[in-house]
Amino acid sequence: MAMKSLSFLAVLSLLALTLPLAIASDPSQLQDFCVSANTSANGVFVNGKFCKDPKLVTADDFFFSGLQTARPITSPVGSTVTAVNVNNLLGLNTLGISLVRIDYAVNGQNPPHTHPRATEILVVEQGTLLVGFVTSNPDNRLFSKVLNEGDVFVFPEGLIHFQANIGKAPAVAFAALSSQNPGVITIANTVFGANPAINPTILAKAFQLNPRVVMDLQTKFKK
């Protein structure tokens, strides 16, 4: 009896340790697919989205067109991201993956940011990029590499990373992310463009800056 109790406790402990790993990413699907539906009509509620009735699903629900064309670059950082996720490709719902195209102007960058729910794997299609990510505290170690056409680099989930065009011509990259909705937290926009604004005194102390400099940055990033 004592041995059975010990075995039960061992199994229970193992489950307790593995459960956080099991829920650390998008949940596994319980059916072949769950095409997201915009309304509850003819649908069921699964994983945060209404699922379209499988009998009404068509090939178009798994199709997106648009990554073949570069979008205009109008951002001050000199890059444009075209995302394909569950919001514009409904068939991605529950499948745990998404895709982006990133266009970089000369000297443009995709500034330091994180994806709170996804690992990213990036391949350069055109140009030369300087890429990198920084590990968590206390080491804050930088892993950086220069990528040319056809080169691939991985950014671990949740870590701050960036890409910068260091070539003499525009650059293009494609990236896959391990979530249907990976999320993006751009560090500068989040810290200095928070709504409502973070108290400048707090940021001045955190960044060792004059409060006036912080207020100037907050003005620049104000939405």
UniProtKB/Swiss-Prot annotation:
GO terms for cellular component: apoplast. The keyword Amino-acid biosynthesis does not apply. PROSITE patterns: GERMIN (PS00725). Glycans are attached at N38. The keyword Secreted applies. Its main location: secreted. May play a role in plant defense. Probably has no oxalate oxidase activity even if the active site is conserved. Oligomer (believed to be a pentamer but probably hexamer). This is Germin-like protein subfamily 1 member 11. It comes from Arabidopsis thaliana (Mouse-ear cress).
